[in-house]
Regions:
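Peripheral, non-transmembrane regulatory/ligand-interaction domains of membrane transport proteins
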Residues: 1-204, 209-212, 216-219, 223
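Hydrophobic alpha-helical transmembrane segments and their immediately adjacent juxtamembrane loops
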Residues: 42, 218-280
């Protein structure tokens, strides 16, 4: 459980307790965090349940003045996981002078987001500015993770060029699944972003920031699409190669079986109780 209160006026500065217009960052919330958010700040109970759903799609919701925004951000599991690279929901909850982010996983993206904003030393103009900066950060991290995926694909291909191994084929299959999750989540975030332009109060600075986010998401989507096509083609190539190898082996085994069958066939013929002309 990590609950941090950030003063966002002049850069990000950690403070001891909640105050109006601060950013409440909650990571891996436990029961005490849930009580604080629901009882002290008064957020709707189902908001946290929606954020905790790992399959929750990117969306915007509004309930009695409360705004819930869920975007999907990249997340790295264990390397041997079924999908080493996947996406998880990040929830942003706002109302008046209250701004909260909730994530049920500890991510490099959020750590980097805080570090980068502190380095900028500018903070956020308002909650809407922070929302779009989180979108921008997620797009940048999608591109970072995609580069890592491409590096793993290249490594597996080099290994397969030397020797076709099941472990490398399984690794490529897992990365194929990861790319599917990335493409789906990026498209969902883009759709959500287009809605937020009309749902939130967007000023001129926000409009420029949204344009930057659109560019980054478009690049991430196109990159993920290219890697997906390359990986699909690679998997098809190795599948054909394996099929050809199996066909060659089967032909050889068939030839050996036919050759080995002749002695048995001759013995069977001469062992029959038939007159063959050689008995006289």
């Amino acid at each position: 459980e990590v609950r941090t209160f950030w003063n966002t006026q002049n850069g990000l500065r950690a403070i001891e307790e909640w105050e109006p217009n601060c950013w409440v960052q909650v990571t891996c919330p436990d029961e005490s965090d849930t009580q604080f958010l629901e009882q002290k700040l008064g957020i709707p109970e189902y908001f946290l349940g929606d954020i905790a759903d790992t399959d929750e799609r990117p969306r915007y919701d509004r309930d009695e003045g409360w705004v819930l925004i869920i975007l999907r951000i990249p997340y790295v599991k264990e390397v041997r996981s079924r999908t080493p690279y996947t996406t998880i929901p990040l929830g942003i909850i706002m109302k008046g002078d209250i701004c909260i982010t909730v994530c049920n996983f500890e991510t490099n993206m959020m750590i980097d987001f805080v570090t980068y904003q502190q380095r900028r030393g500018l903070g956020f103009t308002d909650s809407v500015d922070m929302v779009f900066r989180l979108f921008l950060s997620s797009a940048v991290w999608y591109l970072k993770r995609l580069k890592q995926i491409q590096s793993l694909i290249d490594q597996s291909k080099r290994n397969l060029d030397r020797k076709v191994d099941n472990a490398d084929l399984i690794a490529l299959s897992r990365l194929q699944d990861s790319l599917t999750y990335f493409v789906t989540s990026i498209r969902g975030n883009e759709t959500l972003l287009s809605k937020l332009k009309f749902k939130l109060k967007v000023d001129e600075l926000d409009a420029d920031l949204i344009e930057d986010v659109n560019i980054e998401f478009a690049q991430a989507r196109e990159t993920a699409g290219i890697y997906t096509n390359i990986l699909d083609s690679t998997m098809d190539t190795y599948a054909n190669l394996i099929n050809n190898n199996v066909s060659q082996v089967m032909k050889m085994l068939t030839s050996i079986s036919i050759i080995m069958m002749f002695p048995t066939l001759m013995a069977s013929l001469f062992g029959m109780n038939l007159i063959n002309g050689m008995e006289r």
